[in-house]
Amino acid sequence: MGLVAPSDREIVRELEDHGAASLWVGGHVASPNPTPEAMVWLARLVEQTERAIVGTATLLLPLFPPALVAKQIADLDRAAAGRVALGIGVGGEYASDFDACGIPIEERGSRTNEAMELLRAFWTGEPVTHHGRHWDFDGLRIHPPPQQSGGPPIVVTGRQPVAMRRAARLGDGWMPYLYSPERYARSVATIREEAQRIGRDLDAFTWCAYVFVSMDDDRDVARTNAVHALGGTYRNDFSEMIDRVAAVGTPEDVTAKLDAFVGAGVEHFVLCPIGPNAAENARHLVRDVARSLDRGSPTHG
C-alpha cells in the first residue's frame, strides 16, 4: 500500500516505519488551490525516507522540457538508491498551469507522448539524436543515468481512454483517480486489449489506483468531510458521486471498497486521506488496513 505523503516530515517517517510501501507527491504550477510543485517535493521526500518507493502522483509532464525531467529524475533516483517512480499525466484541469509555463494546452497529449519516449532514451546515458514534433536534439547526452536500469518506472495517470492507450503503449503502469471499482475493471480490459493489439506483453505492468479516503466511526461525518474536501479541490459538487469515486465511511466501509478495487485488478494503492482527520486516517490505513491489501509496489530493476 502507498500513501500520498503529508507535509509533516515526522508523519512521513512514521508512515514509513509502519510499513508504507510507497509515498507520493503531486502538484501544480499555477492552480486555483495552493499546491506544491511535484519535483521539488519529490526531492524533499527522497531525503525524508530510506526504504519506501517515492514517486510523483502526478507530474504534469507536458509542462516541462523532457531533458530537464530526465536529468532531475536520474539524479533523484541515484540519491534514493533506486527507489523513484514517475507518475505522469497530461493535466488540463487548470489552463493556468499551461499559461504559466508558456505551453499550448492543446499540445499536452502529443508533448506527453514524445516526452515519454525521450525520457527512456535519455535514461540510457547515451547520446540521443531526436527530431520530433516538439523537440530536436543531436547527440544530446544526459548522464550519469538513473540507478535503476533503463530508468524508473513511468506510471500513467488519467481517466480517459486516450490515457489508457498511452499506458498500454508507453507506460509501466496505470493509475487512474476518481474511479469506481467497476470503472477500474473496464479500464484494465481496455488497456489489455490495446496491448494485445500492438503485441505488447504486460507481465511487468503495475496496476495502481489513486483513491481518496475519508474515514470516521460516523459514516455521515466521513461522507461530509469527503464531499467538502473534493468539492474544494475540483470546484464541483461531489454529493451525488462521492460513494462511487472515493473510499468513504467507517474503517469497515473503507476496507470493503478497497477490497472491491483489488477484485477489479488493483495491485498497488496510492491512498490520499482527505478531511480534518487525514493524518490519523493515514496512520490507521498503513498500520491496520494495509496488512490485507498491500500487493506490491511499482518498481522494477
Name the predicted role of every residue range.
Residues 1-49, 54, 150-152, 272, ...:
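N-terminal beta1-alpha1-beta2 module of alpha/beta enzyme domains
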Residues 1-3, 23-25, 53-57, 84-88, ...:
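Hydrophobic faces of well-ordered beta-strands that scaffold small-molecule active sites
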Residues 45, 76, 119, 154, ...:
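Conserved, mostly hydrophobic/aromatic
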Residues 13-17, 42-51, 73-83, 168-169, ...:
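Acidic (Asp/Glu)-rich catalytic clusters
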Residues 36-56, 111-118, 122, 286-301:
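Alpha-helix-loop-beta-strand connector modules within alpha/beta enzyme cores
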Residues 1-4, 63-129, 177-178, 182-189, ...:
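Flexible, glycine-rich active-site loops centered on histidine and acidic residues
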Residues 1-7, 59-67, 149-159, 213, ...:
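Active-site mouth loops of central-metabolism enzymes
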Residues 5-15, 72, 156-166, 250-260:
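Short, acidic/polar
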